[in-house]
Amino acid sequence: LRLVGSEMCIRDRDIGNKYAVTGLARLFYRRIGEHYNKFEQWTFPPSVATATMNRFVKDADLDVLYYRRITNAKVQNKRIQSITLEDSQKPDKKTLIQVKAKQFIDCSYEGDLMAKAGVSYFVGREGNEEYDETLNGVQMSFWHQFPDGVDPYLKEGDPNSGLCWGIQPNTLKERGSGDKLVQAYNFRLCLTDNKENQRPFEKPENYDPAKYELLARAIRKMDLHIDNYLLFNWGMMPDNKYDVNNRGPLSTDMIGMNYEYPDGNYATRERIWQEHVDYTKGLLYFLTHDERVPSKLRDQVSRFGWAKDEFVDNDNFPTQLYVREARRLNGEYIMTQKNCQGEETCLLYTSPSPRDGATS
């Protein structure tokens, strides 16, 4: 629900053959199809995904604890005996509850249960030598690059004036080397060009136009416009809606501003989360209102707005930050590049029985 109900509603299946999708996942896409009077449907807006997931919960008669987050895990003899949860909206001792079970499964983005249980993990990107890989670690990417000639200084041509927002003065490490940095986060947006179901992009309370100076300079250097996908990745959905993702040198990804998130406490994560909200809303306001943006581009972006019937309890804004990566479990078997390229296959092994209370 956290994934499809808030963000990934179109393209991130990342498979070449839909017949590889089976089980409950296949049933999910076929139930989405029922909504559109089709056999199955692979693209869909968040509201339809949420309703479909809630149907699964209702059919299974599950008790779901919403807005709860872990504060502690009691472990004995390498087995989780119980976990303590607090109400994320009212985090005090009065809201604490304890949950006991034979098995606990951490299906979260962040892996907080894993960390609280003392399981070893890694944050960042391993170097090539760690698992004899070639595509991990520091890499130079062809995509999402600035054009030549974009000045990085606050006052163009003056190194003494300081760097524009978003630029870090660090030296790029050797290709293939490891570090503790994580892939950028963003919000996957649900926008529409249907004027009858649309809210305009409004100026956010903490709007700072300086955060988009580099984008303004890139626009001057390139013929950046909305149709050729140089600003956003547009995924078409039913009902004149679009799943909007990052693309280009400066887009919806808030690059370099999430490094504290994986191991951060809840207050740190909340700060980072809100910074991403402000940045994203500010980006769309900038593109539709700032005079540094050519009128042609402003008009193109202004065709779109927030879908009024999506995320109705959250100002029509996504409820989930796209945490692309955080903690990585150091498990009995670790998937590597060789697995992805078909050079190695994980052999089956006997794991501890769920009845023993093993963690997953």
Could you say what each language-model-derived stretch is?
Residues 91-103, 107-351, 355, 360:
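Flavin (FAD/FMN)-binding glycine-rich loop and adjacent Rossmann-like elements that form
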Residues 11, 80-81, 136-140:
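Short low-complexity, flexible loop/linker segments enriched in glycine and/or proline
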Residues 6-7, 11-72, 76, 122, ...:
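Conserved N-terminal/central alpha/beta ligand/cofactor-binding core
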Residues 4, 78, 99-102:
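Structured loop/turn residues at beta-strand edges in well-structured enzyme cores
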Residues 3-12, 349-354:
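Conserved small/polar residues in nucleotide/adenosyl-binding loops
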Residues 1, 55, 112:
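Surface-exposed charge patches
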Residues 76-97:
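Conserved beta-strand-loop-beta-strand element in the redox core of flavoprotein oxidoreductases
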